[in-house]
Amino acid sequence: IIKVAGKQSWLSEVLRTPEDWQLLREARCPVWLLNASRQPIDKVIAAVSTLDESPEHSTLGDRVIVQAEALAASLKVPLQVVAVIPDWNASRAAMAYVPPIPAQTVYLGDIGAQALQESRERLVAILERLDIDAEKAEVRTGTLTLEIIDAVGDQGLLVIGSAAHRGLAGKFIGNSSEKVLHHLKADMLVVH
């Protein structure tokens, strides 16, 4: 499905589920949402999660990367595979109580560095399994929406997966693709 992305106010999104979100949740095929500008695509960004290791998310991540690689090859533009993990030093989690571990001192900075390293290793392993150059991997720390939007820029094409939360979870939690869509200025392909 190819559709021009609609823009709505934040209040409108709270009061009623936007049509684009409904389409992303219900479609059984990939959905390509076009931005209003007609600028040529200069790169393809595959956004995947390295934090959720469930079989469903792993399969979805593989589909996202394979689809993004095919698009980058056909458009003759670079491919970049991006994962985002929370910034432990800047998040509210950094102020949370960390229970002591016997005979060990725990530093949140160390936890963040370890999470970043593990995320990089997972992403490289995924790319190697899919026979894609590991140099295309990038793990960012920060807020998912802001980091993805920064990676894509104004002329990129974002390829992202949607596991489609439904019901109250969909209303209050939402999906990463929906959160990014609200702020993205570039095209987005959502893979299910």
Question: Residues of each region from the PLM?
Answer:
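Structural beta-alpha unit
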Residues: 1-2, 7-11, 125-158, 162, ...
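Structural beta-sheet core signal
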Residues: 3, 33, 46, 81-83, ...
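Glycine-rich, Arg-bearing micro-motifs that act as flexible, cationic patches
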Residues: 3-22, 41, 157-183
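Short, acidic/small-residue loops that bind anionic groups at enzyme active sites
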Residues: 22-36, 186-187, 191
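Solvent-exposed polar/charged
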Residues: 25, 73, 150-153, 182
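Small/aliphatic-rich secondary-structure junction motif
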Residues: 43-106, 113, 132
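Short, surface-exposed alpha-helical segments at coil->helix boundaries
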Residues: 65, 113-124
